[in-house]
Amino acid sequence: LALFLGLVFSFYSISAFAQIRDAEIAKDDQNGQWLSYGRTHNETRFAPFEDINDSNVQELGVEWYIDLPNDVGLVSTPLVVDGILYFVGTMNIVRAVDAVSGEILWTYNPRVAEEIAGKKKVGWVHNRGLTFYGDKVYGATWDGRLFALNHKTGEEAWITRTFSIDTPLYITGTPKAFKGKVVIGNGGTENGPTRGFITAYDAETGEEAWKFYIVPGNPADGFENAAMEMAAETWTGDWWKNGGGGNAWHGFTYDAEMDALYIGTGNGAPWNASIRSPDGGDNLFLSSVLALDPDTGEYLWHYQTTPGETWDYNSNMDIVLTDLEIAGSTVKALLHAPKNGFFYVLNRENGELISAEKYAEANWASHIDMATGRPVENQGARFNNNTKITPGPLGAHSWHPMSYNPSTGLVYIPTIHWGVQYNDEGYDGEFTSNDFEPNLAVDWTEDLDYEISGSLQAWDPVGQRQIWEVGYDHMYNAGTLTTAGNLVFQGTAEGSLMAYDASNGQTLWKKDLGLGISAPPISYKIDNQQYLSILVGWGGGGAAGLDRDGSTLGWAYGRHTRRLITFSLGGDNEIPSQPAPSFPEPLVDTGFQIDPNLAILGETAFANNFCGGCHGTAAIPAGMAPDLRASPILLDQQAFYSIVRDGALVSRAMPSHPDITDDELESIRHYIRQQAINAQRQ
């Protein structure tokens, strides 16, 4: 009888839950929920709630918070479905939380550390989010698995591998669910000879439905479809030997009106187009907005933002859909602000360019020719004479999502202001490992004349002009949320959650959260109460130390607690204070005799094994991993070898490098010790 009653209760509990399908995701109100990465299929990140508004936002207080002491970089967008908040943290661990009280209901650990042990060298700890469809939560792991979870219990409904773990590919992106399917892509363009693709799976069973490759393969093997045959005409040389790239690691939008799936595609592999495709060519479908049939994966149309891409100007940024009034007509518009510094408005019915203007510094091209839809490149932009180019490879806008407010008609873009020096001297055209290899000489450590900064700008997509801008001292600030309360929310690299007047950019509220913020906020309503939630945990490329900017913030590894924080009007809880920003003191041991020749070799070994991907370029970290210059582990040869080669700290997201040699390990030790001395001298 007890078993029978339990089954009956379970049946009625599950039946009471209204499954989430495309119609629910498409609704503006969504009954107060946040059902998808960009809230609706249109990816606007607009919350149509006005309880919290420009007249009372200063009354926001902490409703509840959760400490996440074992997490590192937090960059994901939470979901809120039926009163439960779902989010993904470090190493793809998923948690379900009561969205009103903050109580953790269940945790799912896909055990990424164990999966990648001895197989993957680059230990990314980030993921940008989950998706919800039907009655399941979907996520993906860095090592390439796609999973579906029971939304009530967190138990696996199914899990499947989307690529071999032995390839250079990885996943940091959010799956996209629509029409009974779940789509996922992958990254890895810089990690080896990759040929990007996206795959759709049956949402109920996990069975593969279709796959679309983004660049053509070896013509001798035949082409998968007519689109690949067409694309191959735009490549030269033996491009397939280096893969070609194009990886779709982010930027999926489903258009229910057009019944189309839009994919933002990646940059070339290797970066340098003169090596990748020596006799020129546009190299389709790199750096493009690609429209596919959502049922079959068949090609519909494309628009390429950067033909013959060579600067890491991918188009993986979010794709936003809306209707715009242009010249007296309603246009079904697609809005896109990729890395290359131009803001594009496309007609999503056919992919035709409506307008394009610079939204940031971009000296690689003068303008977009409206007759051809192509950029007009400036002389010397393609690595000539160590040219300094804007934007740099991190782009004028990265993955940090922009938002669109239909009331103001404005797009709110987290913008990066930065340039680097490109050249192709000393280029090595061979990928040597599954580690990060841009394969062109971009000196990330060189001090350039360009200032590094960031900004939030409000952009008019109809007039193609900036309406207002707020400047920041640092470039890697978080994605945005805009609301019907005439507000724009954004977290900053310096650790503040900001609320701005959506119309004029006036600062209305500021809350110091004690740690750099990389994740975008969300808003939801339960029982007529509006909430604002955000993950606080400095992450992404800024925290990895890929550039010098992040290392100046003082978010030292292990000192600052990561958190999920939820606010409400009149919230009266207090979050514990965080330590002040700090910079670990480099450890100098006079008993360690540095061999200068080994240190020189160690610089190369440090780069080739992508140690800098977590510990910072030139061993100058930015918070995602310990400062090795201050670590006593470097003084203990056996302990250092055990961690780096044998994986003694795999459970803490430090990957093992089983193939690294004693000579490489020793040279890295000497290089880091040399960097410690150099830091002390400064």
Residue ranges of predicted features:
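Sequence/structural segment immediately N-terminal to covalent heme-attachment motifs in c-type
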Residues: 594-617, 642-646
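Repeat-blade elements of multi-bladed beta-propeller folds
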Residues: 34-38, 71-93, 119-146, 170-191, ...
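Blade-level signature of beta-propeller repeat domains, shared across WD40, Kelch, NHL, RCC1
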Residues: 522-582
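Extracytoplasmic beta-rich repeat domains
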Residues: 66-77, 107-131, 156-174, 213-251, ...
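C-terminal capping alpha-helices of c-type cytochrome domains
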Residues: 140, 151, 598, 657-682
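Blade/loop signatures of beta-propeller domains
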Residues: 20-62, 218-228, 374-377, 445, ...
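Short, conserved, GDST-rich strand-edge loop motifs in beta-rich repeat architectures
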Residues: 184-196, 236, 263-283, 417-449, ...
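Gly/Gly-Pro-rich "capping" loops immediately C-terminal to redox-active cysteine motifs
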Residues: 616-649, 653-656
